Amino acid sequence: MKKSTVTFGLSLILIALIIPATVFAGDEISCTRGGMNRAIAKYIDAQTKGDISNLPFAVMVGYKENMKAADIKAGILNTPMKIDHHASILDTSSCQTFTEIIVTDKEKPYVMGTRMRINHDKIAEIETLWTTTGYWLFNADAYLKYATSEDWGPMAVEKRSSRGTLVAAANAYLDAFLEGKLDLVPWGFPCERVEGGAYTGKGSPDDSCEVGVPSGVNITNRRFIVDEVTGSVHVFCNFGPDTPDGGMGSADSHLFRVENGRLRYVHTLTHMLMSDFKGNKDNVPKQ
């Protein structure tokens, strides 16, 4: 056998070995922006199909819906959805992602927020808060209209804030619900807030998110996901305190974009039926 033939044969074997490894590496999730985006793509594909079989779960993956432990095999992830829009933020410091999903299907519309935690090349936790018809101020069509008109993309470096500043801005906003100290919130102008589907913006440079903020409400159990690149910070929290009988405030999601240290956009979802609303002047949900 000629040497050239042997060399050619060995080359083919090496190519056959290298290509699958390269493809696999390109598909692998990790705690990098690229790796987390790949995890999100897999999650969106699974939610679209209602099929979790191809998600790379860690052993004993943690799963919650509306802040309560749930069976991932029976959860909303198994419901096929026609997703109209999704957008995500990436926290490379804590290896977490947050994804907002909007579904305007007339039969079963949803607006959802999902947190994932990545552990090396596996999804270690998934937590979803979902809202649908009958929930607090729900209007998926309006939410889609307003969310898609906003810029949540990478921010110019000179407009970005530090991780600490982003968390402080979110805390100041949420603290105002209890203390009523609105002057401590870094309000930006304009600032637009989408709450379930209700919108505070009027297209004016003076638009404010300082509209309809109640007082005397303790927003508890705050957990943060921070993306300095997009100037975004997400908070899963409870609208109201835990109670001695094991109850807790309504499961709540707040997503903020901060430009030049000031609030630009606020998105809010609350897993609370409108029929459970007390209807008092302070917007306090039933406990």
Residue ranges and their predicted role:
Residues G9-P20:
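Bacterial N-terminal signal peptides
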Residues F24-Q287:
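C-terminal and inter-domain tail/linker signature
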